[in-house]
């Protein structure tokens, strides 16, 4: 090839390059050249550049996925900025926190599902633990009411046989009617009590308001019998029954109470106006009235009366008339 041919070839190449540059500046593209460049670009993107680890073109994916990628990138950037700020001084921390407050607030308003530091992004939501309800028991709800003792029944053994007719004739404040009741009925004023004296030497004392009064009254009756010439002794004193009463100060629905506690209670208003409640532990019988008055009987110690009332009080509160 001669030199003139080479010169013509280089001149044509230069002319073609200058024309291409001019077309680009004027915004003119030939279809053939554009298709060639697009195919070259796509082949280059599909080939070596993917192997080199460059990012893929995700423009053909749905908008939701692209938005999630952008939000994830934004979240990672914000976390990186927070870590960087935590390493700076206190002054820089205040300044950066003020600047970063606006985009964080905007991001939370636009995406309420991402609030809470990313907790709601996980498939498992943190649940607030529920406080178990503790059932009401007599220990947790004190009534503040103390039943008052009304009567104490005690027994004692005088240890000798007695002539009841002679005792009734010699003693004052004594009566004896064997046709009606086979015992001498004797009364004293202090403490105000009544005694039933049997021919076997057994005696029952009733009417005392406390354990001490009951014992004192029984000793006085034994002394009277001893003064009449009988070798009476004071043996086996024992309290058999204690009766107490109180007022809960609110009316009670006895019909609902007997339906709920059929196993322990009975209510026959035509026969007796009060509900009879038989408590198992302690073994106490309660008479409950509509007015709120409660009578407790069957106890041998004060503690049993107090325990029984504290057990029944929450139940009565549940059936209070509105």
Curated annotation (Swiss-Prot):
Q: Which Pfam families match?
A: TBP (PF00352)
Biased region (Polar residues) positions are: 32-42
Query: By its UniProt entry, which PROSITE patterns does this protein fall under?
Result: TFIID
Keyword Nucleotide-binding (UniProt): no
GO MF: DNA binding; transcription cis-regulatory region binding
- Tell me the keywords, alphabetical order: Developmental protein, DNA-binding, Nucleus, Transcription, Transcription regulation
Q: Name one GO biological process term.
A: embryonic pattern specification
Domain of life of the native organism: Eukaryota
What Gene Ontology cellular component terms go with this record?
nucleus
Instruction: Output the InterPro entries linked to this UniProt entry.
Output: TBP, TBP_CS, TBP_dom_sf, TBP_eukaryotic
The answer to whether UniProt assigns keyword Transcription to this entry is yes
What SUPFAM superfamilies would the database entry show?
TATA-box binding protein-like
Please state where this protein is localized. Answer: Nucleus
Q: Where is this region: Disordered?
A: 31-54
Q: Where are the transmembrane segments?
A: none
Question: What the protein does?
Answer: TATA box-binding transcription factor. Members of the TBP family are differentially required to regulate transcription and development during early embryogenesis.
What does the sequence similarity comment in the record state about its family?
A: Belongs to the TBP family.
Entry protein name: TATA box-binding protein-like 2
From which organism does this entry originate? Takifugu rubripes (Japanese pufferfish)
């Amino acid at each position: 090839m001669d030199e003139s041919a080479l010169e013509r070839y280089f001149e044509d190449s230069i002319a073609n390059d200058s024309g291409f540059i001019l077309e680009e500046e004027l915004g003119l593209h030939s279809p053939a050249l554009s298709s060639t460049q697009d195919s070259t670009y796509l082949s280059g993107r599909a080939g070596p550049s993917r192997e080199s680890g460059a990012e893929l073109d995700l423009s053909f994916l749905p908008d939701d996925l692209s938005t999630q990628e952008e939000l994830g990138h934004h979240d990672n950037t914000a976390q990186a900025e927070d870590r960087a700020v935590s390493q700076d001084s206190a002054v820089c921390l205040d300044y950066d926190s003020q600047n970063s407050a606006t985009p964080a607030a905007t991001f939370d308003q636009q995406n309420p599902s991402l609030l809470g530091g990313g907790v709601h992004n996980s498939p498992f939501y943190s649940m607030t633990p529920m406080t178990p309800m503790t059932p009401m028991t007599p220990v947790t709800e004190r009534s503040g009411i103390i039943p008052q003792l009304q009567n104490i029944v005690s027994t004692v053994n005088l240890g000798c046989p007695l002539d009841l007719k002679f005792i009734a004739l010699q003693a004052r404040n004594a009566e004896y009617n064997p046709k009606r009741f086979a015992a001498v009925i004797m009364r004293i004023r202090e403490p105000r009590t009544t005694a039933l004296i049997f021919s076997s030497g057994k005696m029952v004392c009733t009417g005392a308001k406390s354990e001490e009064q009951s014992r004192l009254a029984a000793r006085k009756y034994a002394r009277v019998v001893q003064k009449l010439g009988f070798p009476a002794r004071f043996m086996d004193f024992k309290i058999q029954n204690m009766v107490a009463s109180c007022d809960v100060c609110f009316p009670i629905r006895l019909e609902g109470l007997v339906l709920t506690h059929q196993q322990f209670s009975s209510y026959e208003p035509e026969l007796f106006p009060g509900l009879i409640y038989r408590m198992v532990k302690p073994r106490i019988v309660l008479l409950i009235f509509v007015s709120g008055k409660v009578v407790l009987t069957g106890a041998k110690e004060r503690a049993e009366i107090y325990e029984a009332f504290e057990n029944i009080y929450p139940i009565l509160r549940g059936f209070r008339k509105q």
